[in-house]
Amino acid sequence: MAENRRNDREQSEFEERVVSINRVTKVVKGGRRLRFAALVVVGDRNGRVGFGTGKAQEVPEAIRKAIEAAKKNLITVPMVGATLPHEALGVFGGGKILLKPAVEGAGVAAGGAVRAVLELAGVADVTSKSLGSNTPINVVRATVDGLTQLKRAEEVAALRGKSVSDFA
């Protein structure tokens, strides 16, 4: 009973977005085996976001597995208001994503998989450019890589042993 309540609370805490569903085949002696691979992004629109992949013979089961994997793979995104603290370049495989902070009210200028990650992270004002590969999994991983590189001014000041006012 308590397990169900915890799962219900988790359900309401995170929003999920299916980025891609891919039909994959494995050739065996008797023919082809069909499976589905799902890529899902989850986030609370408050600075926490994660992604996961799942594979199964049915689409709903693949999505469920991907959601579980995404919830185990959450990162926290440092934000300044509704935008990013500074520019970042995320790289994964052939995918490169350039993330730039934008002025308040600019909105999310990003496409496809990048938009899903940024919106579910709660970033409201950002500009992005996808360079290189446009494969959804590489784009999502590169975006998450870019978000993990972000640091607040306070963190940088502490690392350098200076005060925040020295950076102004």
UniProtKB/Swiss-Prot annotation:
Family: Belongs to the universal ribosomal protein uS5 family.
The entry's keywords: Ribonucleoprotein, Ribosomal protein, RNA-binding, rRNA-binding
GO cellular component: small ribosomal subunit
UniProt superkingdom: Bacteria
Molecular-function annotations in GO: rRNA binding; structural constituent of ribosome
Gene: rpsE
Domain S5 DRBM stretches: 14-77
Stated role: With S4 and S12 plays an important role in translational accuracy.
Protein name, as recorded: Small ribosomal subunit protein uS5
Stored InterPro entries: Ribosomal_Su5_D2-typ_SF (IPR020568), Ribosomal_uS5 (IPR000851), Ribosomal_uS5_bac-type (IPR005712), Ribosomal_uS5_C (IPR005324), Ribosomal_uS5_N (IPR013810), Ribosomal_uS5_N_CS (IPR018192), Ribsml_uS5_D2-typ_fold_subgr (IPR014721)
